[in-house]
């Protein structure tokens, strides 16, 4: 089986080296990002980033879930990112 795969790869490399290189680059692009040390931090940043940002609204005094100011800190802290 390995001999057949090796023969196929050798034959393909002889006929179409550009396709082989493009498939290798594409395969590495899929495989390598999870192995990167930055992958962990990008996941942590994406979890801490809010999907919706506060919009200034007129407070009539009957909105307990609205922050008093749009820039009030809410959600998970990013202090771990500042300490890197």
From Swiss-Prot:
Annotated positions of the N-acetylalanine modification: 2
Annotated GO CC locations: mitochondrial inner membrane; respiratory chain complex I
Annotated membrane topology: Single-pass membrane protein
Regions that span the bilayer: 19-39
Domain of life of the source: Eukaryota
Main location: mitochondrion
CDD domains for the chain: NDUFA3 (cd22902)
Disordered: region residues: 56-84
Alphabetical keyword list: Acetylation, Electron transport, Membrane, Mitochondrion, Mitochondrion inner membrane, Respiratory chain, Transmembrane, Transmembrane helix, Transport
Subcellular location as annotated: Mitochondrion inner membrane
Signal peptide (residue range): none
Family affiliation: Belongs to the complex I NDUFA3 subunit family.
Quaternary data: Complex I is composed of 45 different subunits.
Record function comment: Accessory subunit of the mitochondrial membrane respiratory chain NADH dehydrogenase (Complex I), that is believed not to be involved in catalysis. Complex I functions in the transfer of electrons from NADH to the respiratory chain. The immediate electron acceptor for the enzyme is believed to be ubiquinone.
Protein name: NADH dehydrogenase [ubiquinone] 1 alpha subcomplex subunit 3
Organism of origin: Pongo abelii
């Amino acid at each position: 089986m390995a001999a057949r795969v090796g023969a196929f790869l050798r034959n393909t490399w002889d006929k179409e080296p550009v396709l082989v290189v493009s498939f290798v680059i594409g395969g590495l692009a899929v495989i390598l990002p999870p192995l990167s040390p930055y992958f962990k931090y990008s996941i942590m940043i994406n979890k801490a980033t809010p999907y919706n940002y506060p919009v200034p609204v007129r407070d009539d005094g009957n909105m307990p879930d609205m922050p008093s100011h749009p820039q009030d800190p809410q959600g998970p802290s990013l202090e771990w990112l500042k300490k890197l």
